[in-house]
């Protein structure tokens, strides 16, 4: 449904992902689509994560990677960050981009709520260099309210930290 539909593209400081301990001071091409599997009242990006009528530009994985490579040459870009909305709801596009970017020596950063089955996560992890996982709260009741599962997120935090660089965010 949202394969290649980019609502946002920007060259951002890596610290904006936010990642404090991964290539500090560098820039990364940040891309995002629309949609999310959670429904948080406090969402910073609700306009793109929860709205049905969002403007977007259709891009292929090759176009995204070529843009990232051009920005690497021109502005020191280190890779691609999948962010703004919940990128894992567009898993196939993220997987295709990450695999291609990895083959070209670009870094892949995933900014996620961590709600994905371990099988798909394990397939993607070889191509992910760093993650910021948003731990929304630490109660099961809160996760039930927003449509998630705290235990799944905690399990994925542990799983991911065994394979790649992981930093956590708790917004509220």
Regions found by a protein language model. Name each.
Residues 42-48, 136-137, 165-166:
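Short, basic/glycine-rich phosphate-binding loops at helix/coil junctions
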Residues 131, 136, 140:
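Acidic/histidine-rich catalytic cores of soluble enzymes
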């Amino acid at each position: 449904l949202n394969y290649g539909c980019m609502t946002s593209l920007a060259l951002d400081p890596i610290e904006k992902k936010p990642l404090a301990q991964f290539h500090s001071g560098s820039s990364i091409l940040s891309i995002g689509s629309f949609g999310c599997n959670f429904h948080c009242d406090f969402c910073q990006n609700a306009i793109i994560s929860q709205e049905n009528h969002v403007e977007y530009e259709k891009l292929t994985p090759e176009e995204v990677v070529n843009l990232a490579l051009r920005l690497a040459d021109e502005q020191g870009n280190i890779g691609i960050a999948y962010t703004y909305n919940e990128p894992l709801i567009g898993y196939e596009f993220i997987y295709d981009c990450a695999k291609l970017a990895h083959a070209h020596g670009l870094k892949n950063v995933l900014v996620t709520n961590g709600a994905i089955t371990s099988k798909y996560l394990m397939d993607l992890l070889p191509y992910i260099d760093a993650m910021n996982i948003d731990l929304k709260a630490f109660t099961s009741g809160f996760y039930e309210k927003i449509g998630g599962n705290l235990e799944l997120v905690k399990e994925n935090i542990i799983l991911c930290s065994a394979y790649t660089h992981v930093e956590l965010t708790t917004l509220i």
